[in-house]
From Swiss-Prot:
Gene name of this polypeptide: pgk
Organism: Halobacterium salinarum (strain ATCC 700922 / JCM 11081 / NRC-1) (Halobacterium halobium)
Transmembrane segments: none
Name this protein carries in UniProt: Phosphoglycerate kinase
Subunit structure: Monomer.
Positions bound to substrate: D21, I22, N23, R37, H60, Q61, G62, R63, R117, R157
Length: 398
């Protein structure tokens, strides 16, 4: 069954529950440190409000016990500033207070309901039919006429707010969800040569992306960066030194070294590994050829080197499509930002360009790189879609 979108929804004067992902970094004082995720959902919310819908926003923020576990009042205030429509806040999610807040909305008004993760059900994975019986869905659904899921970044999860409402309400994909599915599901239809850039510190995810792309003929080239590159270098027998080797084994990435070796044996011509790396020496960036490794003492490999950036830029210049997943180094540190900035700058010049979410999107914002066709809002969800893994929240919409 095809997923319905906002094009199929008659929204006027109807109460629409909209699940978004506005989980954002907070300042020490509890304010919003970055509103990128809120901005991502503005088009969906604005379209519904312009159509005179009465919008109830559902979202989560942080985890219990964490510094960023907070009420959504500040999120409501920010959405009120971003949208050309009134947005209020309700400190309830599915109780009588929440239902009354929805009932009191005039057409073209929105209310942000309280953090769904204040309730234990949102920490449990449910089959959709079981999710429909939870207190959250059972309590709030009677106040709603329809449900819109725009939370692609949470689509790999199966909590009640994501998979329960489609069991009991007409349900639709929002504009963020629609754009993400179109972009990330359509990689096989993009022009070739097609190059994947994999990096970051989430090694199993990136290795899986590379393996899937290579085994399914999606990638003509895979440029390996970040901690992922360290794992691949280790698979070729390169001694990374004590610090980087310990980092790999402390995270139980030893099995990924074996998997990298298998990929190199099967797809050596398509895989591109760094020829030089960067470490910190006497407070400065020091670049070393991979032939000159291991580095001295406790020096850790924290970035790819400039020769690698140049080599990867040449591959990207000959590519028609690029899929980027993961930064090339510790880009938050100016000493080790060059690799990520250089590779991402080159990738942004490719005719067709798709970027995974999470740290990749954060790096793009940090370096103010423009030109990418699609920058995903999702980390784990983007990985699942790029590897054909399950997305329960998407399946629930079908």
């Amino acid at each position: 069954m095809a997923i319905r979108t906002l094009d199929d929804l008659a929204a006027a004067n109807r109460a629409i529950g909209v699940r978004v992902d506005i989980n954002s970094p907070l300042t020490a004082a509890g304010g919003l440190a970055d509103d990128a995720r809120l901005r991502a959902h503005v088009d969906t919310l604005a379209e519904l409000l312009a159509a005179d819908a009465r919008v109830a926003v559902l979202a989560h923020q942080g985890r219990p016990g964490g510094d960023e576990f907070a009420r959504l009042e500040r999120h409501a205030d920010r959405l009120d500033a971003l949208l050309d429509a009134p947005v209020s806040y309700c400190d309830a999610t599915f109780s009588t207070g929440a239902r009354d807040a929805v009932a009191d909305l005039a057409p073209g008004e929105a209310v942000v309901l309280e953090n769904t993760r204040f309730y234990s059900e949102e920490y449990m994975a449910f089959a959709p039919e079981r999710a429909a019986d939870t207190a959250l869905v059972d309590g709030l659904a009677p106040a709603l006429d329809a449900y819109v899921n725009d939370a692609f970044a949470a689509a790999h999860r199966s909590q009640p707010s994501l998979v329960g409402f489609p069991e009991v309400l007409p349900s639709y994909a929002g504009r963020v969800m629609e754009a993400e599915l179109d972009a990330l599901s359509g990689v096989a239809d993009t022009p070739t040569p097609r190059t994947y850039v994999v990096g970051g510190a989430k090694v199993p995810d990136s290795v899986e992306v590379a393996a899937h792309a290579l085994s399914h003929g999606l990638a003509d080239n895979v440029l390996v960066t970040g901690v992922v590159a360290n794992v691949f270098l280790a698979a070729t027998g390169v001694d990374l030194g004590r610090a980087s080797t310990d980092f790999i084994h402390e995270r139980d990435y030893g099995t990924e070294i074996a998997r990298a070796a298998d990929l190199l044996a099967a797809h050596n011509d398509a895989l591109h590994l760094p020829v030089d790396v960067a470490v910190e020496r006497d407070g400065a960036r020091c670049e070393l050829s991979t032939d000159a490794l291991p580095p001295a003492g406790d020096e850790a490999v924290c970035d790819i080197g400039s020769d690698t950036v140049d080599a990867y830029a040449d591959v990207l210049a000959d590519s028609e499509t690029v899929v980027v997943n993961g930064p090339a180094g510790v880009f938050e540190d100016d000493l080790f930002a060059d690799g990520t900035r250089g590779v991402f700058d080159a990738a942004s010049e490719v005719e067709h360009s798709i970027v995974g979410g999470g740290d990749t999107a954060a790096a793009i914002r940090r370096f103010d790189i423009t030109g990418f066709d699609h920058v995903s809002t999702g980390g784990g969800a983007a990985i699942n879609l790029l590897t054909d893994a399950d997305l329960p929240a998407v399946a629930a919409l079908r």
